């Protein structure tokens, strides 16, 4: 019997990469998986209904760190550090109990997501020492950089320096390390002197993320309206999209743009909101002018109606929801919704474009949401930062922007069309040419560059070996994996 514990100190349902790892591990011969994390939202049915996967839910800390004493700042100054210590101790005790008592023997490997790094990596090292098992760290980002962002502190602040030391010291002796970007691997191996095997393992979409036929899209959008109680103008916009699936070039087109956000500081939603307002103001005015021009000139510019669907949960959602509600939009609508896990891939497949506002705290991670969008062959507009070029290739599968002005320009480029006698003219600015070309590129990549094909490179890490030759073979796989990632990147470039 081979048993792997997959640990994420976060919501399992909102941790797609760790769910995909669990699914892949469950397919290994004679292997059982114990998935440990918070069960705040329901994991995918392929996790819940899998006989080879057992979920061990963690209990959240009973006091909210973000809301406690918010209205009493003076008390917050003294109580927040005490609460933070209590929360870490609560997590340590719970993780130790689950991994030392509830997870049965034999346990061969622990695969842990980082961040959060504290207390996760520290606890995992202790458990691995006690139980004599391998630790594999799946690096999504750097924990201390997220802490620095949330506390608005500098690198030299004592808390940030301590967090960085703990993360580096307890991580460096892990059996193996997985990195979401090549830049992350280079930086951590060089600066933190990591000892274990290293693999660049770019995020890949699960098979549940795929394209849908026009008919399947129509059926899902009708279900979406009823299931999520979409009413009023929002419903009218979606019904217009449904009509577009069967009627080519209607006089007034509507497109769906989706953005999945955590509503946190490293995803500045105001950039998208400002771009929407600029697009709306510009084309609401132009729409009135066009009515006059149509009587004098048969050639005018048609701006599509845009329906923005924003998914996700997070601390700033209420703040931006109030801003959205105060807007009086003419050419656009904004819906905020929290989707069931099985509905999210289907909605992505129904959209015309995705937007990513993820701006990395470390500069060396990549947004999983873009990977999922690409899985559904959905082109993406992404905010520009250091490593995003490892994922988004300009003019191939998306575009990059730095601010709301550039995002507004891209929306104009993709969703405004010259018309002649109220019929859209095929020009290079036509969305039907630009986005369709990108969809074809993504479809081609999707056929070969899959989660399953990439996961084969790290598979040896989770198969028990009793000889040094097996270990040597795994090291060889590590080298070939890294070169494979580089070759794959070169081909895409």
From Swiss-Prot:
Entry EC no(s): 2.4.1.142
Molecular function in Gene Ontology: chitobiosyldiphosphodolichol beta-mannosyltransferase activity; mannosyltransferase activity
Residues in compartment: Cytoplasmic: 93-109, 131-493
GO BP term, example: dolichol-linked oligosaccharide biosynthetic process
Pfam families on file: Glycos_transf_1
Primary localization: endoplasmic reticulum
Catalytic reaction equation(s): an N,N'-diacetylchitobiosyl-diphospho-di-trans,poly-cis-dolichol + GDP-alpha-D-mannose = a beta-D-Man-(1->4)-beta-D-GlcNAc-(1->4)-alpha-D-GlcNAc-diphospho-di-trans,poly-cis-dolichol + GDP + H(+)
Residue ranges annotated as Lumenal topological domain: 1-71
Transmembrane segments: 72-92
InterPro entries: ALG1-like, Glyco_trans_1
Compositional bias segments (type: Low complexity): 465-493
Superkingdom of origin organism: Eukaryota
One GO term describing the cellular component: endoplasmic reticulum
Pathway info: Protein modification; protein glycosylation
Membrane topology term: Single-pass membrane protein
KW Transmembrane (keyword) present: yes
Chain residue ranges for the region called Disordered: 462-493
Residues in the bilayer without spanning it: 110-130
Keywords attached to this entry: Endoplasmic reticulum, Glycosyltransferase, Membrane, Signal-anchor, Transferase, Transmembrane, Transmembrane helix
Localization per Swiss-Prot or TrEMBL: Endoplasmic reticulum membrane
PANTHER family tied to this protein: BETA1,4 MANNOSYLTRANSFERASE (PTHR13036), CHITOBIOSYLDIPHOSPHODOLICHOL BETA-MANNOSYLTRANSFERASE (PTHR13036:SF0)
Role played: Participates in the formation of the lipid-linked precursor oligosaccharide for N-glycosylation. Involved in assembling the dolichol-pyrophosphate-GlcNAc(2)-Man(5) intermediate on the cytoplasmic surface of the ER.
Family: Belongs to the glycosyltransferase group 1 family. Glycosyltransferase 33 subfamily.
Protein name: Chitobiosyldiphosphodolichol beta-mannosyltransferase
Annotated organism of origin: Dictyostelium discoideum (Social amoeba)
Gene (name only): alg1
